[in-house]
Amino acid sequence: MNRTLASIGAVAVVSACSMGSSMTIVDNATLPEPVRVPAGQKMKMAATGVGELTYECREKANAAGAYEWVFVGPVATLYGGDRKTVGKYYAGPTWESSDVSKITGKQVAVAPAGAGSIPLQLVKTDPAMGAGAMSGVTYIQRVNTKGGVAPSTTCDAAAKGSRQQVNYQADYVFYGA
């Protein structure tokens, strides 16, 4: 049984069978309130996502001549505690298990993470497509984020339409009622 401590509260990683991943036990009381799962939710599984977030240089809405990097979408591989691939995460947002069951969802809330890291996040999921590991998942937390913020390179008229990928990593914790 593997045990580690993560940067946000005390998070233990314990071997488990769900999705072939390690289960991350998250003490919601240690997380910022906006990204805590509602009462009655139970952790079903967890995975670490490693991949890239794509940003595109676009003109700011209602600000002619001003530009900014805009998030386009993610592409990540989901790994279990044994470091084996257990699924993938991509635009939608969509989390797809290796058993091809998948879920989409909508962001409920975010909370700041460490400098240079994308925010922590809480997502309310839609019903799963396909039977499998994603069946019954109702919420997903993104915690322990590393990297992934918009590029620091210049975004101006000359760069308009250009895209850049930024490396990131995060733990995804899946819950069901």
Language-model segments: residues:
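Bacterial N-terminal signal peptides that target proteins for export
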Residues: 1-8
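Primary mode marks residue(s) on the alpha4-beta5-alpha5 output face of response regulator receiver
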Residues: 24-52, 61-177
